[in-house]
Amino acid sequence: MTDNVSRADLALKWDLCDHCLGRVFAMVGTGLTNDERGRSARADVERERGSRGEVLPPHERCWLCGDIFDSVPRFADAVIRSLSKIEHNNFLIGTRVDPEIQEKEERLWSEVGQDTAEPIKAELNREIGKIVEAKAEKPVEFDTPDVVALVDTRFAQVDLDVSPLFIYGRYRKLVRDIPQTRWPCRMCMGKGCERCSFTGKMYQTSVQEIVGDPIQAVAEGTDHFFHGMGREDIDARMLGNGRPFVIEIREPKKRNLDLGSLENLINDSGKDRIEVIGLRPSSREEVRKTKAASPNKTYRVVVTVHGKVDEAKLNEVLQSFKRTRITQQTPVRVSHRRADLAREREIVDLHLEEIGEGSFTLVLRTEAGTYVKEFVHGDNGRTRPNLSEALGAPCEVRSLDVIEVNDDTSEE
């Protein structure tokens, strides 16, 4: 008697269906289903016992699974009904089984070994998936499925775990005093109070809401999350090529969206406040890349100077700052939410764009993470060197615009 026939003979001291018997040998050979392996193993045991004058009792009801595999078509139909309620391009099956079944399976393995065995849930997932794939004409996707259909085999109940929808784009913020993301009221923490006129928000709207609300509505999702490549100050505009972002829509019922129409819808509803460009499908991996990116940025800054500064001196000072590294202690204005650390940042390039009475306009490109306002006014000596100190005259930022995000991380 071969080792595998011996193991099958030992396994059949319990009344097992062909699926549960064959699953003991799931890793032996290729090209067969577990059901086929089980039939073959059963025939081998019948011959072996027959040679000893013994008879294998006829199969009645599987001791291990209770003949659960007879219900696989019913489970598959339940999955198809559930999946028909949402738009998806692919799927994956998961299952729950009675804990007693798993306990019996482990008992079987302890007797006959599990080196070549496969768990019952793996076979159920595969067999249900094969039927759904054929009937629904949608492929199984193991790595990044649009939806996981979780079948509770005790009740033939199906729960759907719908993957988020990710959409990449770039936004321009054409006005000041709009935050990038929803900002809960500091007084009530979003519950609603007199301070926030019972909206629960510090600001009436945000880039996230102007962009995310229309997409969520069209996708019929339950919520949205905004992942930006950094963020500008609330009082700064974001112009030029726009800031990259990925919007994440939770539990979307629709996935195949007309992004060109959505772009127009967002820009129309933005009402000259927010524009989006280049909407396209994205991924969780691109969210990670977007949030981790640290691109240089180019700014246009209107500076008020308290004192007389001639253009020649100003140009000389600006020239001296090119490729200069500055040290910035955490600014006072953000010290309540940032650790008090000294950070070195590079002023990559800067030049004078315009000069007037008591003010000038500066264009500068800086390393990611540079506090531009503090570079201008010095933050009471917490940023050095700084423009005010170099000019010998106090300077303040009147307005600041981001005019380019110099990134190269976008997926093509």
Predicted regions and their residues:
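Non-catalytic RNA-recognition surface used by pseudouridine synthases
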Residues: 1-412
